[in-house]
Amino acid sequence: MAHAILVGEARKRSLSIDIYSAGIRDFSDQPPLIETSSTCLHYNTPPPKVRPTWVGELPLRSIDRFLVMEQVHADALESEFGIPADRISLLGEFDPKHRGIEIDDPFFSYSEQTYRKSYELIRDCIIGYLDTADELR
């Protein structure tokens, strides 16, 4: 969802930035999650691409900022993929309502309400990031 939200918000601001989305575990052979797609559609956000992407498939050296939901994701980017800590940010750090720096993955909830709350939190954090990110100026 974060990728879909960031693409939409960047487009609203006419930002010309490359946006990638990937997991630290390889689920590239799995279909997109129905819950993610239906939540995005509920908020009139085009849903994510056809299949999940694994971080190892990305052009890692060319990416300036990695936004992650949980510290475990940041740790994996550093230890498994050699990404310097100064290029990684917890998305929750940009939450204007300060609800916490980590955002729980709604996957295991299987709950429409949880997915919608996650969407709204992620959207708020992405807007906060876009409003404050020095690398976008």
Predicted region positions:
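Short polar/charged helix/loop
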Residues: 1-137
